[in-house]
Amino acid sequence: STPIKSSAASDVYKRQMEIWESAVLNTHDFLKEEDFLYYKEQLPVYFQHVTLFGFEQEGILVGFMGIAKGNLEMLFIDNNYRGIGIGKKLITYAIDNLQVTKVDVNEQNNQAVGFYKHIGFNTYKRSDLDGEGKEYPILHMRL
């Protein structure tokens, strides 16, 4: 059976929050403290607008992604499990099974930009501000 499962946020919400925090603290070092706290507070709202899929290893949720209308809206891997191919498995599943063709990435998150380029995404547009109007430039990428 696949380690990728559709999951309602409420079932594993606490664990998703832990994963988000672990991932963001280790990949988004450009975030101001108050913005980190703002996004953390907004997570429940973001979760309501996506279909969530989790990746389990030995029964433990170690990563998840959120999909909406062909867009990969979020992909977070617990920092202890990064670099072993889980993100690639999730995004491959999304492309092959969920018709995902687009992703928006923080330009300052070099690891993520490199990851998506490696998968085959290319930047087609850039925004100076993120979706919340904050000064974190976004690269709009597509396959």
Task: Put a short name on every predicted segment.
Residues 42-54, 71:
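A short helix-loop-beta-strand connector motif used in the catalytic cores of GNAT acetyltransferases and
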Residues 1-9, 13:
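Single conserved hydrophobic/aromatic residue that forms the stacking wall/gate
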Residues 117-126:
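Conserved acetyl-CoA-binding loop of GNAT-fold acetyltransferases
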Residues 21-44:
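Conserved GNAT-fold acetyl-CoA-binding loop/helix
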Residues 96-108:
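Conserved GNAT acetyl-CoA-binding A-motif
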Residues 83-96, 114-118:
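Conserved acetyl-CoA-binding loop-helix of GNAT-fold acetyltransferases
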Residues 71-82, 105-106:
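A short, internal acetyl-CoA/4′-phosphopantetheine-binding micro-motif in the GNAT/acyltransferase core
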